[in-house]
Amino acid sequence: MFSKINTILDTIDAYVWGIPLIVLILSVGLFLTIRLKGVQFTNLGRAFKYIFKDETDGKHGEVSSFAALCTALSATIGTGNIVGVATAIVSGGPGALFWMWLAALVGTATKYAECLLAVKFRQVDEDGHVVGGPFNYIEHGMGPKWKWLAKIFAFFGIGVGLLGIGTFTQVNGISSAVNNFFDPNNAWTVSLFGRTYSWTVVISCLILTFCVALVLIGGIQRISKVAQVIVPFMAATYFLAGILIILFNITDVPAAILTIVQSAFGLKAAAGGALGAMVVAMQKGIARGIFSNEAGLGSAPIAAAAARTNEPVRQGLVSMTGTFIDTIIICSITGIAIVLTGAYDMGLEGVAVTTKAFQLGLPFPDGVASFILMFMPRILCITTILGWDYYSERCLEYLTNGKKKCIKAYRWVYILCVFIGPYMTVSAVWTIADIFNGLMAIPNLIALVALNGVVAKETKDYLDRIKKKEID
């Protein structure tokens, strides 16, 4: 039964993440990069400066720009960086990392544009809360006649949160990491749903579900407070561990980079299979890249809309740093560590690949690396779960016109999905996530192209004011 389901999911995934969507994502990012004159490169320094400098006259919004960024990062830095990169490299080869980089470089412009539009077209609901996202700028930017497209986005946004990035993949990654550390041989097992699971999976799942339920009651303010504390510390810790692997194996780094580039273009495959290898690397790299940094997916704009700012461009600049931090820095460290240690070619899958890379790359006992890869996903994935509950709730709020009973009921359904996440197969979990990601991205990408003139005008006006020293 499970094999049939996996076959069906793989077929759907192949259609959703075929060449057309890959071309669309890269084309929109490249188009916006050219249209905005490389804003993600020319203003990257200013963007990082804005992260820690609150806008003094920002009156609209619920959280600071830094908190909004941390909320967005809390939903991106997690399983995608630790497990997603490993999955992409195992299934698509080392070249998948190259396509993740390329998608991130042009995707930074995409992230900038979508977060700018989120602030530009955000609304205030009947309770006085600021809400916004692709559904808002599709309806209010493109016009009421496009409301059907906004509803499609919101529907798939709920799917991504409930069945994709938000729950199944995160909890699956957490439980696998905990089980690999405490009970790698599955010595303590229990039968559930017709299958056998380790008790560590069941217990960790119960604890995680309880913790998530406690935080979700507090809404965006509590989520952002948790994210502001956890995300910077965990990201820095993981970054340090990855840098140590690279430094301890610095002589192998050039060969690893060469392998990544050659594999990206199928140069290591037989002549007849070069194109096929390249396409697979592109598909897996871009799909996992979108999963990780969410550029173009339309999720980050929902968090950006809550930022206390009067300047859409400013928040767009702050938000675009999330893609740079997530993929260019954190995913790169994971990917390079996996390639230079050869962990991707050892018959492992999921978090076990990254764990093996850390064990081989760090001059510490294997238990230390296992603990790092057990502890890090557990914390980072919790913040991803929290962030995606907020995103998907806003999507449901849009579809139901803010009916509170629906939101409260959905919250418990979301918590239930967190609970059942570990009992899904790894391959099925990631395939479901990929499918919903692709379907969610399409309406948002259409809107970004349609509203590119608004983004360009806002950007030009803001940068002109900087030149005139009206703002800094």
Predicted feature residues:
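Membrane-interface alpha-helices at helix entry/exit sites of multi-pass transporters
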Residues: D57-E62, G93-L102, H140-I152, N186-G194, ...
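Transmembrane helix-loop junctions in multi-pass membrane proteins
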Residues: K4-I5, R35-Q40, G80-V85, G161-I174, ...
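Extracellular/periplasmic helix-exit of transmembrane alpha-helices
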Residues: T33, E114-R122, E126, I243-T259, ...
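Alpha-helical membrane segments and immediately flanking helix-loop junctions
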Residues: G58-S91, L117-G141, I152-F155, G159, ...
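Flexible loop linkers connecting adjacent transmembrane helices
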Residues: G38-S65, T87-I89, G93-L97, W101, ...
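Helix-loop-helix module between adjacent transmembrane segments
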Residues: L32-T33, S74, A103-G128, F135, ...
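Membrane-interface loop-to-helix entry segments
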Residues: L24-F31, L36-F48, V171-V178, W199-V261, ...
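N-terminal alpha-helical transmembrane segments of multi-pass membrane transport
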Residues: M1-T79, I89-A96, G107, F419, ...
